Regions:
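Class I S-adenosyl-L-methionine
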Residues: 1-209
Length: 209
């Protein structure tokens, strides 16, 4: 379960005397809107936890197909920067719009369309996340507003900014055959006739009894 997994990660980080300088976490994009009855609470708990541990965070939902790869799969990537790193200090000095659209890790590596807006507050949603995990768990988004966390954002000192971004890609679209092995596939990767029926059963639909 994702909740159990997160607390295992949190415990490991909490017990480390020398915190990792950088964290990279990945999950299905549904994390940003779960649970159904309190949308965004699970992600808010993660952000609050990382803030307690001394991390600034940026996240982005990325669909590989929108950047030229032959796979349609949306995932949310979460990157944390510990407070003694240069990038943490740069985040503190940066304007939210600049970080999310040009200066941040994701903005540099996964380009997005630049919005035509005059003021940051017209395009960004601001969220203040409590440092008390119990309060976050009990009271975050009790009105259950939809999509509190958009597909991009960052958090530092509990101050969170989030917005919707649109991918910008003009490169060549890769095809699946580009990544296929050209050399002969070894026999161990083939399914024998004897095993085929077993595979069909294991992969097929099953009626509950």
């Amino acid at each position: 379960k994702k909740g159990v997994l997160w607390w295992s990660i949190y415990r490991i980080l909490e017990e480390k005397k020398r915190k990792p300088k950088y964290l990279i976490l990945e999950n299905v994009d549904r994390l940003l809107i779960s649970p159904n009855t309190q949308k965004g609470r699970d992600f808010a708990v993660i952000l609050s936890s990382l803030d307690q541990l001394g991390y600034a965070v940026e996240w982005r939902v990325i669909n590989a197909a929108e950047y030229g790869m032959p796979q349609r799969r949306r995932r949310v990537f979460i990157v944390g920067y510990y407070k003694n790193t240069d990038i943490y200090k740069r985040m503190r000095k940066s304007k939210p719009m600049d970080w999310l659209f040009s200066e941040g890790l994701f903005a540099k590596e996964f380009k997005v369309q630049q919005p035509q807006v005059l003021f940051d507050e017209h395009y960004l949603d601001y969220i203040s996340i409590d440092s008390d995990l119990k309060k976050v768990t009990k009271s975050f988004n009790l009105d259950n507003f939809d999509r509190v966390f958009k597909n991009a954002g960052f958090m530092i000192d509990g101050q969170t900014y989030t917005t919707s971004v649109t991918p910008s890609f003009s490169g060549e679209l890769a095809k699946l055959k580009t990544f296929l092995e050209k050399k002969k596939v070894e026999e161990e990767f083939y399914i024998t006739d004897d095993d085929l029926e077993k595979w069909k059963y294991e992969k097929g639909a099953k009626a509950k009894t």
